[in-house]
Amino acid sequence: MITSLLAGMTILVIGDSHLATPGYLITTLHDELQKKGAVVYSYGACGMAAADWVKPTKMKSPPPCGTATRLNNSPIDVNPGPNTGTVPYGELVQRHTPNLVVFVMGDTMAAYKEPTLPRAWAWQQVTSLTKAVRVNPVKCAWVGPAWGTDGGMFAKNNKRVAEISELLSETVAPCTYINSLNLIKKSEIRAFDGQHYDAAGYKKWGQVISKALDSPEVAGKAKQR
């Protein structure tokens, strides 16, 4: 018998490259939410920042990493690009009428290759999307980035991860912030390229996100709407 607070809910998950490849969160998080009795619609797009989900935005990252969609029990539909892009948040809400929207975004706005975090730009990205949330009000949660490995092709570094996580925690309202850094230890997740994780890492991350969503603060409030 399913006793989860998420049971019977419709959940829309929107994210960056962590949701754009089979085996990543579009597999693990999606599966975990379904196990709890939710109907789940997941959308991922490589290299897209938050504001890119406010209006249709063409793919920025070169193939083979493009977009991916998973509509509840349907198989994952991967489009490697370049002729693909985002579906706006407002359109997705109208299409799926979710009880809860989950954003998984942070790495694309951390600008790891830049000498400093572009705080004003990142703030603008986030608030552009949260403004759209207020126009199409649905209870939402925002999942911040998890620890990575310093270096690699994306130049991810954990000092910057902590910086962008702090900025997100102060900026994502009305969404509830889920701080991945507090949910999973560095030793529990391994990034093979500095930013993206092996199968065990995505499984662990999907589990802790699902557990955080299955709480009175998130799922409970979503059901009250």
Predicted features and spans:
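Hydrophobic alpha-helical targeting segments used for export or membrane insertion
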Residues: 1-10
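Conserved SGNH/GDSL esterase-like catalytic core that processes O-acyl groups on lipids
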Residues: 11-14, 18-116
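Extracytoplasmic/secreted envelope proteins and their assembly/folding machinery
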Residues: 26, 30, 86, 90, ...
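Active-site segments of SGNH/GDSL-like serine hydrolases
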Residues: 102-112, 129-162
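Catalytic His-Asp segment of secreted/periplasmic serine-dependent ester chemistry enzymes
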Residues: 146-225
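Extracytoplasmic/secreted cell-surface and envelope-processing proteins
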Residues: 21-24, 51, 110-115, 119, ...
